[in-house]
Amino acid sequence: MSPPGLVVVDKPAGMTSHDVVGRCRRIFATRRVGHAGTLDPMATGVLVLGVERATKILGLLTAAAKSYSATIRLGQATSTDDAEGDVARSVDARHLTSQAIEAAVGGLRGDIHQVPSTVSAIKVAGKRAYKLVREGQAVELPARPVRIDRFEVRGLRAAGACVDVDVEVDCSSGTYVRALARDLGAALGVGGHLTALRRTRVGRFGLEQAYGLDELAECPRLSYSLDEACLLIFGRRDLSADEAEAAGNGRALAAAGIDGVYAACAPDGRVIALLRDEGARTKSVVVLRPATL
């Protein structure tokens, strides 16, 4: 059995996130592999995977902030808001100045309401939006609040009648960079879509910790053990032996006065459970090492 932990993968272009999971199931010789947030097939970069019991904490990582580097093409709108869709509209964008582009980018920073791209995994009446679009159905998704902490222009260059804009983005979970490209183009009146996307960070995990799939195939290894990952992401509470046994059985403990989810550690340093305070007692978020294990 593979030891439990997290693997930070540098996903190559052309693979779905599920493809990467399938490859890592073979590499680590276990079915218990999952990911903490989908990357589009055209995108590259950070994909956080959980192996064995570490799959239990993946749901807590999906809400982490994300960082991206991307290229937006101004002057063309597409059916998918990225380069994989059909061009729906073309407008000569060569008149755009860097000042106009910077001003439009600034209008998309901070707390905004964003309409997700229709070709997305969001469910509409129990069905994925992208499947409805493929079936020829009209899909209207409601705007939802997201936060754009950084939306910075790193370079501009001509691309025929279009303008390619290299950007870096720090954003909340649930943000669609494709939708940012679409909305930037709309704000400038020329249309826009995403031509390249690389995720550089998910919460505490960045490209500097990422392995390529070929590296992992040659030498399977975790980026972090389960204990290392939990203590990197969450606060820590040290338990007595009796408390550790109780936590391993899912029983409540006295509250610790720690904000949010925290890792509850046995005297030997192993993380027994992730807990959170609710009033005067704790509530188990997930028991990682049950007392019966």
Swiss-Prot record:
Active site, per annotation: 40 (nucleophile)
Domain of life: Bacteria
Keyword field contains Transmembrane helix: no
InterPro entries recorded: PsdUridine_synth_cat_dom_sf, PsdUridine_synth_N, PUA-like_sf, PUA_sf, tRNA_psdUridine_synth_fam2_C, tRNA_psdUridine_synth_TruB, TruB_C
GO BP, sorted A to Z: mRNA pseudouridine synthesis; tRNA pseudouridine synthesis
Record-level Gene Ontology MF annotations: RNA binding; tRNA pseudouridine(55) synthase activity
SUPFAM superfamilies: Pseudouridine synthase, PUA domain-like
HAMAP family reported in the protein's UniProt record: TruB_bact
Protein name: tRNA pseudouridine synthase B
Organism field: Mycolicibacterium paratuberculosis (strain ATCC BAA-968 / K-10) (Mycobacterium paratuberculosis)
Taxonomic path: Bacteria, Bacillati, Actinomycetota, Actinomycetes, Mycobacteriales
